[in-house]
Amino acid sequence: MVLRGEFCATLKKVRFCGILYVTNDSFKCYIKVGEPMGENKTPQELDFERKHEEYLHRIQNLRLIDDNFMTKVFEDKECSEFLLQVILDRDDLTIREVHSQYGLNNIQGRSARLDILAVDEQNKAYNIEIQRNDRGAEVRRARYNSGLMDANITEPGDRYDQLYETYVIFITENDILKAGLPIYHIERIIQETGMLFGDGAHIIYVNSQIKDDTKLGRLMQDFTCTNPDDMNYPVLAQRVRYFKEDTKGVATMCRAFEEVREEALREGERRKAIEAAKRLLLGGKLSYEEIAEAQGLTVEEVKALDTKRSA
């Protein structure tokens, strides 16, 4: 497993995600030290080691086209700025702020989490989404994200002409629009004249299947690289190398994996609680309050599940 770090050529100890390794720069790898697997260790310790060894292996196989890794890399302002400069073919673009996994809500309370939300010096807002699954990049989702951005980046009392110019950009593993093009720009037009409507809302699809020798094609090559040494653009390679080879970067990715795992467990428990609440509602013996307390839900959530009584 290649996990280089900032070490001298002599043998040194380092911890990755709580596990002790030794490294020698001559070999540029880590070797775990300590007791052999299974010897004098509790089941909890064995599970901990197994889980983190799995994380280390997964980190080495991560690519920019992978959603969780992409958000970590491009929450860096310099990287997101470079990405947008290439996609929009604008060397003059300067990003003022960038946020990853940015939550937005509509007026009904339904939320969406944007992979990357960036704002440039001219107050133009950019939502960048990575999608390996075709369903996640449906055209109406692009419309939905565009509307959410309008609703969330304006203040009450703002004039319509103060609306930010917005870009929703999907970088997709497959050619969603199926025309064999590297990039698609979607704009509203006036059908009778063919002229642009000019409302300031832009949607762009980038097809990562096209890996030619253009700036965009080389960028898409980088999106499918697992090894930073094989990447074309140093600004991206340096950031990828940090998360794959630097002790702090690897630890950050381990924590990110653990957070995803814990969230999945919470979602699983919540689904079980909802199904149990539905069964109790069908039984008709308990009140909303009793069911809510028993399943760890709110009374409002239980009422919303009661399709039988509300029908």
Region locations from a protein language model:
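Pocket-edge structural micro-motifs
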Residues: F170-E173, N207-S208, K244
